[in-house]
UniProtKB/Swiss-Prot annotation:
PANTHER family per record: DEOXYRIBOSE-PHOSPHATE ALDOLASE
Protein name: Deoxyribose-phosphate aldolase 1
GO biological process: 2-deoxyribose 1-phosphate catabolic process; carbohydrate catabolic process; deoxyribonucleotide catabolic process
Its biological purpose: Catalyzes a reversible aldol reaction between acetaldehyde and D-glyceraldehyde 3-phosphate to generate 2-deoxy-D-ribose 5-phosphate.
GO cellular component, one term: cytoplasm
Organism: Staphylococcus aureus (strain MSSA476)
Length: 220
């Protein structure tokens, strides 16, 4: 198992500078992480810098609120892919989910999946804002919409991934859809908990610390 390929090395802070983007790109190349995950404004630059590597470019859509229109999310997705994005992490319409407007939620996801045309789409449901039944429903809608992953969190809503939520999401979607845990995964212990719960991708700014923990752990 290549643990480095579980990691989307992430920098989504609004104040991120080019120097900081360079740092996570260099780290991702050094450790051969699955991707770097950056805001759309950095996608083109990251794609150019990663062109000679296996590391993919991941970006975020409708982020962090999920409250932009479906048409806006679709355009953002198209623009990101034209700029070199390989993977798309979109935020659902959380208010629509809570209203019970499930068709709206599913159609919002479907619009992004359609524009992404074969690029990996991960759907952020923001678990910290949802109850048990809402997590289940959001996971079901993600699967029905044809997305590749259901993802826990943006990291901007006051909480992140828990192993319990990851397990619930995985139990809901089954083998056809993968689970990405993000938000608060800061060390090897957190990483292991998420993987054991069913996550096959980890979004973290602490990718280097996680890998250093793996290197220091005699079990690996």
């Amino acid at each position: 198992m290549k643990f480095e390929k579980y990691i989307d090395h992430t920098l989504l802070k609004p104040e991120s500078t080019r120097t900081q983007i360079d740092q996570i790109i260099d780290e991702a190349k050094a450790y051969n992480f699955k991707s770097v995950c950056v805001n759309p404004t950095h996608v083109k630059y990251a794609a150019e810098r990663l062109a000679d590597s296996e590391v993919l470019v991941c970006t975020v859509i409708g982020f962090p609120l999920g409250a932009s229109t479906t048409a806006t999310k679709a355009f953002e997705t198209e623009d990101a892919i034209q700029n070199g994005a390989d993977e798309i992490d979109m935020v659902i319409n959380i208010g629509a989910l809570k209203d019970g407007r499930f068709d709206d939620v599913q159609q919002d996801i479907e619009a992004v999946v359609k524009v992404a045309k074969g690029h990996t789409v991960k759907v952020i449901i923001e678990t910290v804002l949802l109850d048990h039944d809402e997590i289940v429903k959001a996971s079901e809608l993600t699967k029905a919409a044809g997305a590749d992953f259901v993802k826990t969190s943006t990291g901007f809503a006051g909480g992140g991934a828990t192993a319990e939520d990851v397990k619930l999401m995985k139990d809901t979607v089954g083998a056809d859809v993968e689970v990405k845990a993000s938000g608060g995964v800061r060390n090897l212990e957190d990483f292991n908990k998420m993987v054991e719960a069913g996550a096959t991708r980890i979004g973290a700014s602490a990718g280097v610390q996680i890998m250093q923990g793996l290197e220091a752990d005699s079990d690996y």
